[in-house]
Amino acid sequence: MENLNPACASEDVKNALTSPIMMLSHGFILMIIVVSFITTALAVQTLWYKNVFPFCTKNLLLSAIVNGIFHQSTVAEIRLKTVYHLIRYSNAPCSILFQSSDCFYDNFLYYQTALFSSFYCVSLFLDRLFSLNPRSFYNSHQTLGFIVFLILQIICPIAIQFWTFHDSDYTSYVPMCNYPPASSVSGTKFYFINDSRIIIMGTIFMCSLFLYIHNKSREKRMIFNVYNTDSRYKSYENFLATRAVCIIIFSQITCLGITSFVPSIFNQFRQSISPDWFHLILAFMAGATYSNFFLPLIVIYETQLIIAHRHKLIKKLKSQKEEFSDHFASLDFVWEREANKKKTQLVQ
């Protein structure tokens, strides 16, 4: 994102910030946030009371939802502050911008929660990868695994922010408090992190897809090779959890990837893009806000789907168990009858 310096906004930037399209973007984002708060409350209830995910997966999803609450609240506060600022200073181009120092805490929370959204996708993938072996050390110590993942999800974004922004110029001016502070060095670092994020998220998605395909093929093989009811049930549960996580990762990567890709493209061709369109389009590029909107919806839907599939599988396994019992009972009867015949023949 391009920063604006000095304090006075150019005519193009002022017109872009006060245009109906910009106001529409603020209203649209705020509407999404309000709806996401409602669905988030339902998703938390669903995760808390419906025990369908393994311990670590469930708590990683809860941490993602809690992070979403913080992110949506931060974005709502930034947008409302911006709308108030634009209305108050609509005719004052030298007061319409925010000084970066006034946005320090909003900026920190915005990027902390946005980067957290990327890291919990990595954690969810690793959680499902380590869960492939039901007898592994990881499956026996899921609480420890969750704590390690959570610490990394918090510390890594802080470290990235420090590296990116520690030498930034906080006396510069920006249109909104979600814009990074201005500095040629930190700007280069910002786009490097942005590009790296796209590559890493794409890699995680491809790996998640391969993991899902592997779990699906293994589940099909178990139908013909494994007759232990408990083993088959646990394998199917693991498959359903992996599928749900893959869908969640796909939605997050789609939202975060596209909205990270656009600023990177704009950065390469910013000389040929007018400032007003630059800021108008970026106003809609709220990837983490969109991903936090879809996350609770997917959690609710996948939970209900897993419950339905579990009930279906339980009925199927019970039916198969009864068929096996009848089959073995008939075999026992035949074997016993044949044994009695042989005994009779020997006596005669």
UniProtKB/Swiss-Prot annotation:
One of its GO terms (biological process) is sensory perception of chemical stimulus. It comes from the Eukaryota. The chain crosses the membrane at residues 28-48, 108-130, 145-165, 193-213, 246-266, 280-300. Its main location: membrane. It is a multi-pass membrane protein. InterPro entries: 7TM_GPCR_serpentine_rcpt_Sra. It is found in: Membrane. One of its GO terms (molecular function) is G protein-coupled receptor activity. GO terms for cellular component: membrane. Keywords: Membrane, Transmembrane, Transmembrane helix. The keyword RNA-binding does not apply. Belongs to the nematode receptor-like protein sra family. This is Serpentine receptor class alpha-29. The gene is sra-29.
